[in-house]
């Protein structure tokens, strides 16, 4: 692996997992020493992070980790809904060969939903398998490219909220409905199930975000809503 790729993947993962917090300055000298590479690969990695939207150029020289605001989260989910419902419809409209794997996936999610204890890491690996199968069955490279870029930010947003066992089981049931609808070749149900899942996923993040700045933004938004309705 090239030094710039290694630096990029390391920094991207640290941003996604909140090891590098929003506003943190990405200083080339400090990072090159910590990562054990020269400044040029670090500079290239930072440029890629800026292009991804995970870092923000502040003036001529300083680059910081991008923040995640309440409007941005809602915009992400608005785009996610458009992309993922389109993928779900396309997958459910695909031929039997492309839809066959969703039978097994639906069963796997149904089994997960019945478990008393559902570990998050294996569960999200199963979700990733479903995403990959939907991308393949949807057979639209442009939508796939767009949603894969968005998933980088969505993973970061998901980690803002602590996993809840009840929510994981509910999410498993929702994913089972999506997979079953695709397996049955029902685009309308696949779209509706995807829309419902995304509504619940966004609600969970808004209700359980752990970052103080984000919680403050949610509280302010709630106060404005109350003012408008009073």
Give each language-model segment a name.
Residues 4, 120, 164, 168:
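Flexible, glycine- and charge-enriched loops at secondary-structure boundaries
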Residues 1, 70, 95, 102, ...:
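Short linear sequence motifs
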Residues 51-56, 150-152, 167-169:
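Mobile beta-alpha loop/short-helix "lid" or hinge segments that flank ligand
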Residues 1-93, 207-230:
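Short linear motifs at protein or domain termini
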Residues 97-160, 172-184, 189-199, 203:
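Conserved amphipathic alpha-helical segments that form helical-bundle/coiled-coil interaction surfaces
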Residues 5, 81, 103, 169-173:
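Amphipathic alpha-helical repeat elements characteristic of tetratricopeptide repeat
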Residues 34, 164-230:
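C-terminal regulatory/effector modules of DNA-binding transcriptional regulators
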